[in-house]
């Protein structure tokens, strides 16, 4: 395989993966490719926008597409929580945090100023795992009051030695901003948490 073909194939594959990440899933890939070709060749005869107009259009498109996706994620999350709270063993707190006791420990409950040692696995509602101390093979330690609101509230419910499942509404997690590549705006998060100890300092 020649170097030109390698460049072509690797570049094409890269563009393909990037196009998959476009919010809203509404972009016409053929139109985008045609636009790339015109731009690369310097052919402006078929272009209906100048560069400034095109930039503004793309910015507006992305903002609107992200807003639509965030709305969809919120609607899906609200529907899930409404159904989940009716399931056996699921408890909903005043804030909207939902949890289920898998194992009830007999130790002390931490306060908001304590530091704790936990094992946890975090997933999205579709099962996508975004973080896990279990997979890393090492418990995490952090302050109860130094994490997302759902964690701060949930940890104070748990006696040491407990295993709980938490479903955390977006407003008690990362809200409208999301976090990283996996946690989209308005995402409900599921955490399986084992409270191992309250760390004495």
Where are these regions (language model features)?
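Short, small-residue-biased leader/transition segments that mark boundaries at the very start
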Residues: 1-6
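Non-catalytic extracellular/periplasmic "stalk"
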Residues: 9-79
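Intrinsically disordered, low-complexity boundary segments flanking structured domains
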Residues: 18-22, 84-90, 128-130
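A generic alpha-helix structural signal
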Residues: 58, 81, 152-155
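Long amphipathic N-terminal alpha/beta scaffold segment
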Residues: 62-105, 110
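Core FKBP-type peptidyl-prolyl cis-trans isomerase
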Residues: 90-200
């Amino acid at each position: 395989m020649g170097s030109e073909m390698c460049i072509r194939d690797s570049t094409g594959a890269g563009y393909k993966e990037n196009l998959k990440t476009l919010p809203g899933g509404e972009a016409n890939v053929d139109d985008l490719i045609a636009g790339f070709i015109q731009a690369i060749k310097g052919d402006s005869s078929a272009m209906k926008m100048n560069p400034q107009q095109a930039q503004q259009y793309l910015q507006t498109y992305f903002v609107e597409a992200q807003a639509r996706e965030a709305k969809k994620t919120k609607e899906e999350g609200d529907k899930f929580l409404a159904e989940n709270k009716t399931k056996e063993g699921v408890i909903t707190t005043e804030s909207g945090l939902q949890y289920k006791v898998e194992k009830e420990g007999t130790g002390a409950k931490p306060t908001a100023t304590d530091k704790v040692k936990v094992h946890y696995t975090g997933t999205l509602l579709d099962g996508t795992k975004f973080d896990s101390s279990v997979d890393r093979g090492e418990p995490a330690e952090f302050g109860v009051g130094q994490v997302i609101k759902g964690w701060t509230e949930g940890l104070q419910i748990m006696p040491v030695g407990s295993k709980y499942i938490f479903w955390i509404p977006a407003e008690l997690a990362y809200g409208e901003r999301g976090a990283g590549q996996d946690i989209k705006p308005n995402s409900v998060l599921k955490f399986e948490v084992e409270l191992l100890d309250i760390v004495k300092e």
